A protein has these predicted regions:
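Active-site-proximal or metal-binding-adjacent scaffold patches in catalytic folds
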Residues: 1-223, 232-298
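Walker B catalytic acidic pair
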Residues: 228
Length: 298
């Protein structure tokens, strides 16, 4: 596959790609920017010219506009309900499984560009002894104090480091518990920050988990971890993989409900059986996968 950049007067950077396996010109519009700063890519069969891709783009302008508008609306809704992080400003807040993070703008007396993080419990001590996590009831409060001159990339970098610190603690603990409980052996866990996937498992048994997992409700966070652990026994997404993952997901939800998790209660129907009012339920692992896909990474 080879690629070329095209500067469109309306849409900005468009990535043109030639692919030997493509049989027709196709267009993809993503909700997040790619590494070139654009959101649109055009794939062209190897036998055609890049100009053929540009010509097809011209014909599909109205469709692209609609797609961009739909994604903009979707992104705005995602910010409102916490599934995405928009522009960071004074008062911006987001919840993780561990903490409520609030950004506070304060001028600095020294004139130096510095960011401070304050941490304090957000619940009564007796409430912090619960065994389950919830983004609706984080245990800690973290204030990120920043000056007016702070840039968006700078503030996002600070946020990423806060999430990384929480992910290293929580995800390492969770994967260790799951591995022991369900009989998995992995070599190494690495916490990653990327926008392409929530997790991955290598043939060597190394597991990567995205630091954004701490922003998901606990059943969804656990689903991703169990998904990657399942690949240690079932490398592909065949029937065996889905049977194993479904069993693990149901057992985990059952355990969360037993210890009082309010986020797990919505999946109680899958613990009681495979049907509701005579209708067969969609496999739980598929439901959890769809819900994870509605979240946006920082």
């Amino acid at each position: 596959m080879t690629e070329k950049l095209y500067e469109d007067p309306e849409f900005g950077i468009v990535v043109l790609r030639k692919n030997v396996r493509s049989r027709a010109v196709s267009i993809r519009v993503k909700g997040v920017q790619n590494k070139y700063g654009g959101r649109i890519s055009v794939t062209v069969p190897w036998s055609l010219r890049y100009q053929d891709g540009i010509n097809y783009l011209e014909k599909r302008r109205e469709w692209i506009r609609d797609a961009l508008n739909r994604q903009k609306k979707h992104s705005e809704n995602a910010v409102l309900d916490g599934r995405s992080v928009g522009v960071i400003a004074d008062g911006t807040s987001l919840n993780t499984l561990i903490s409520k993070i609030i950004f506070i703008e304060q001028p600095t007396m020294s004139g130096q560009l510095s960011v401070k993080i304050r941490t304090a419990p957000s619940e009564y001590p007796e409430a912090m002894s619960r065994l389950w996590y919830s983004i609706d009831r984080p245990m800690m409060l973290k204030q990120i104090i920043f000056p007016p001159e702070a840039s968006q990339p700078g503030l996002r970098k600070v946020l990423v480091e806060v999430l990384r610190e929480e992910a290293k603690m929580l995800l390492d603990m969770k994967i260790s518990i799951f591995a022991e409980r369900y009989g998995f052996q992995y070599r190494k866990l690495t916490i990653k920050h990327n926008s392409s996937n929530w997790g991955s498992c290598s043939r060597a048994g190394n597991i990567n988990l995205n630091l954004n997992l701490v922003r998901l409700p606990e059943p969804l966070c656990d689903y991703v971890i169990l998904h990657e652990l399942s690949h240690l026994k079932e490398p592909n997404h065949g029937p065996g993989f889905h049977i194993l993952l479904e069993r693990l997901c149901r057992d985990n939800i059952k355990g969360l409900i037993a210890i009082g998790s309010t986020d797990a209660e919505k999946y109680k129907a899958w613990i009681d059986g495979d049907t509701v009012s005579g209708k067969t339920l969609t496999p739980l692992n598929e439901v959890l996968s769809r819900e994870v896909s509605s979240w946006r990474m920082v």
